[in-house]
Amino acid sequence: METVAAPDFARPASLVSETGNVLETQGLVKIYDGRAVVNGIDLTVGSGEIVGLLGKNGAGKTTSFYMIVGLVRPNSGRVIFSGTDVTNYPMYKRARLGMGYLPQEESIFRKLTVEQNILAILETMPLSKKERRHRCEELLHQFGIERIAKNTALTLSGGEKRRLTIARSLVTRPKSLMPDEPFSGVDPIAVYDVQQLVVNPRKTGLALPTTDHTARETLPIADPAHPIDEGQAASEGRKGL
């Protein structure tokens, strides 16, 4: 019987030794109704690194994540991105610095084709028509969606929509991409495919903090993972495989 090699989720060694932290949080605290739902979260994410925030519903991981991306304002603590204190920055200012956000929900235009979805973002950038076309083709190829480039988003499968959503989030070449529970609602058969979609961009040095309410899908790709319970980060989880 032919032996199938185990998936390689390892981070490139050059990215470990030659780059510093892209993202850092210092003592993040969020209080709702007199209760600290997040109580002193410290986190660092380096270039080319995937860091998982793990925990059950209500543990504080999503609130921590939302404070990082700018959806929720912390009561205290700081968020540092590329050397800039962005704690009080709205999402659009963080995006201008290169902080990308990938929500759980589909963020695509359903009535546009796959390539039109990508070009819609490219048209907001200071690029020539030729440069926009080249970048679009580059992303279509990178995510294996060239053959469906002319298909409308309405006709796509769940996996194809996920590919398009991630491709759109990388159009502007962000320094970090923050997928919010990327495995939520994903068919078990498609988990490996989504893991690859999350892992591949880090080969270019992209920093990837991510959240998940189960460890099974995230632990194999995270380096490291931080379990969160009752608003606090527990001991660091095992490294990615």
Label each PLM-derived region with a short phrase.
Residues 152-156, 160:
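Conserved ABC ATPase signature
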Residues 54-56:
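The feature captures the beta-strand-to-loop junction immediately N-terminal to the Walker
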Residues 77-84, 97, 135:
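Conserved ABC transporter NBD signature motif
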Residues 173:
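Conserved catalytic motifs of ABC-family nucleotide-binding domains
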Residues 69:
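Helix-to-loop junction immediately C-terminal to a conserved catalytic motif
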Residues 177-180:
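Catalytic Walker B motif of ABC-type/P-loop ATPase nucleotide-binding domains
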Residues 119, 130-148, 195-199:
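Conserved ABC ATPase "signature" region
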